[in-house]
Amino acid sequence: MSEVKGLLVMDVDSTLVQEEVIDLLGEEAGVGREVAEITERAMRGELDFRQALNERVATLKGLPDSIFEKVYARIHFNKGAKELVDELHSRGFKVGLVSGGFHETVDRLAKEAGIDYVKANHLEVIDGFLTGKVYGEIVTKDVKVAKLKDWAAENGLKLSQTIAMGDGANDLPMIKTAGIGIAFCAKPIVRVQAPYQITEPDLYKVIEILDEVGK
């Protein structure tokens, strides 16, 4: 097996993809505005992420699980997403996703883009309907850091050989932990503290930063 040279771990909503998937689910449930407002406050760091997630998921109670198919059709990769993954793979990197979103959509995105690792939340479904609850470990800012460290260790990498990228307050600890931390079209709280920034929605810009740093 060839040696792994590095690892990129990134957020999904408003980073890998253009949309916030939970906001799309909220729209389908008829509570789009309320859900989007909570999302915005959580991403700015004004709300505890766990609390914000539970509040938003509760509004989805009673939706049929067929909703994921409908919502998936409305999701768009950000420019350069697949090209970035392909280029990193050609350089011997692994790529992982850590998302406060849901496996029901994130797993499909990962498969479509050829991504190696995924950690996301699970929505509880009983008899084909959402219960308004999540189950299992909730992907918080601390879990994002833990997965960055776990996947690095699994591949015999030092943290200096890792890249982390995201847009929201819950991505900041991960961004600060990685060798290269990137704010992607991020909220002000993230832009101010991240070592590197991408200000236009083009994920391939990661390669420019990587080359500039000379890793």
Curated annotation (Swiss-Prot):
- Signal peptide positions on this chain: none
Protein name from the UniProt record: Phosphoserine phosphatase
Q: Tell me which residues this entry annotates as catalytic.
A: D11 (nucleophile), D13 (proton donor)
EC number(s) stated in the UniProt entry for this protein = 3.1.3.3
| Source organism, top-level taxon | Bacteria
**Positions bound to substrate:** E20, R56, S99, G100, K144, N170
Metal-binding as UniProt keyword = yes
What gene, per UniProt, encodes this protein? serB
Task: Identify which cofactors the protein needs according to its UniProt entry.
Answer: Mg(2+)
Lineage of the organism: Bacteria, Bacillati, Bacillota, Bacilli, Lactobacillales
GO biological process terms held by the UniProt record: L-serine biosynthetic process
**Assigned protein family:** Belongs to the HAD-like hydrolase superfamily. SerB family.
Catalytic reaction(s) noted:
O-phospho-L-serine + H2O = L-serine + phosphate; O-phospho-D-serine + H2O = D-serine + phosphate
Query: Membrane among the record's keywords?
Result: no
Pathway the protein acts in: Amino-acid biosynthesis; L-serine biosynthesis; L-serine from 3-phospho-D-glycerate: step 3/3
Q: Which GO terms of the cellular component aspect does the record hold?
A: cytoplasm
MF terms (GO), sorted A to Z? L-phosphoserine phosphatase activity; magnesium ion binding
Species annotation: Streptococcus thermophilus (strain ATCC BAA-250 / LMG 18311)
* Keywords recorded for this protein, A-Z: Amino-acid biosynthesis, Hydrolase, Magnesium, Metal-binding, Serine biosynthesis
Against Pfam families, the record matches this protein to:
HAD (PF12710)
The residues that the entry says bind Mg(2+) are D11, D13, D167
